[in-house]
Curated annotation (Swiss-Prot):
Gene: LYSRS
Similarity remark: Belongs to the class-II aminoacyl-tRNA synthetase family.
Keywords: Aminoacyl-tRNA synthetase, ATP-binding, Cytoplasm, Ligase, Nucleotide-binding, Protein biosynthesis
Feature: compositional bias, Polar residues: 1-10
Protein name per Swiss-Prot or TrEMBL: Lysine--tRNA ligase
Span list, region Disordered: 1-54
Domain of life: Eukaryota
Amino acid sequence: MDSSVSTEPLSKNALKREKKAKEKEQLEQEKKAAAVAKRQMEQHNLPENDDLDPTQYLANRLRNIESLRESGINPYPHKFFITMSIPEFISRYAHLNTGEFPEDIDMSLAGRVISKRASSSKLYFYELLGGGARVQVLASARDSDVDAVQFSNYQSGVKRGDIIGVRGYPGKSKRGELSIFAKPFIVLAPCLHMLPRRLTSSIVDETRTQNFQGITAYDTWTPGDLRNPESYVLRDQETRYRQRYLDLMMNPEVRALFRTRARIISYIRSFLDNLEFLEVETPSMNLTAGGASARPFITHHNELDTELLIRVSPELYLKKLVVGGFDRVYELGKHFRNEGMDLTHSPEFTMCELYMAYADYNDLMDLTEQLLSGMVKDLTGSYKIRYHANGLDNEPIEIDFTPPFRKIDMLSELEKVANISIPRDLSSESANKHLVDVCEKFDVKCPPPHTTTRLLDKLVGHFIEVNCINPTFIINHPEIMSPLAKSRRSEPGLTERFNLFVNRRELCDAYTELNDPTAQRERFAEQLKDRQLGDDEAMDLDESFITALEYGLPPTGGLGMGIDRLTMLLTDSQNVKEVILFPAMRLQ
């Protein structure tokens, strides 16, 4: 034993001095740690406000990501296990009472941060969006697995737009708001760009969100409601259409709109499936464009070294399937027409085409009435909808889908409304000259070529279509306008065809199908004459289709319905780009 080591106990004063020295040393260490944390936060984290220039904001966030990587942290984790979706969380725990916090429940959610506020350095509130619903996340240092400095440092780095994963327990705050009280908290995918600010007093917040037992439902717009895109958080049309993901993120009505589009398509499929129609798929590229009057897109097949046309319609293929024995077929898919773009036309659009053996255009009018009136009633709860037909600055009109729909005979109505006579032999040169004179008389513009088909189409648009607000069938088109339709039984020169117009726009085109191969070849020959006159929308001769008809097409009715225009009506949309997720846009 070393006699130089003293074993005498320290005096009380010495103990006090030693205790004070340790406390002072600990305090200095805490100050240093806090200073280091503060410097790290200033160096690596973005400021809480969004006042920075967007370019600087992006640069700062990129530095933050790189800093995390240098620290050995993956800023984009591979996996986060969630126990339920946010809508399921709301449904399951909406019954909790104010101030009730069942801490024994361990669950996890994930979603996008759409708002954030700090009550103090130890308490943060987030609004988490996912699955069309939003819920509050309450992050408290008390529930955290790290100390207060680390907690504050981490929370300061979480920004609006970040996708986060939260594990915790449910509860209702003192204000009665359902929340998840966070324990572990992880950023799964940072949002590097500055998001538009949500206007807390906007129409979106005050009238487009509903409160249910203290929970805010976000995507609460329903079909039949009016819309006003001017009230959106993100309002610039170009940005909304070019960056649809941002539009969906910021504007809950837009998400609800596209859910409605999906419901429309689902309703059509269910309706037709219940009638024992078979859904099929047909080629999008072929040597001919298909059965419609439109200008096609052209592409080149390298392997075959041949020019191919992108389909304007699947009509001829579908009728070949009826020849083959599929008595009821339909196709829901994309069509392409290399023509102009405006508020109701897109070069890429969605159609439903169906063909029904042993049916005629009268049967299809009944089917169309049942389908559309039933759909409107199912989606909106009424046969009547309101629609801003004349723009958002004017009062909406009412459109009534109550069956039966009105029927108008095309030529009889045209003669009556315009007080003119229409020659019955419309294939003659004299008839063409007469229609040119009529168009000039009423100042009806018809760009060349002045084929009889185009002249009639312009006159019908000028005198009849403009008055078709409620669903209206325009029926019995001339043969010269309908190369694939069967002649009318009682009136030679006319066909068993109808167009359905709603709000002055064509929604459906249907007819009793021409199944006589000899007559079909003659009709194609008439179309060739129009093409030689410069009408590039006239149909080409399709020999393979004529051959199919020679094997025998049963009496058949066919219908085409525009999904985009139908969706416009049921979502109060005035621009077709509103209802197409990624619409065609002009080059910037």
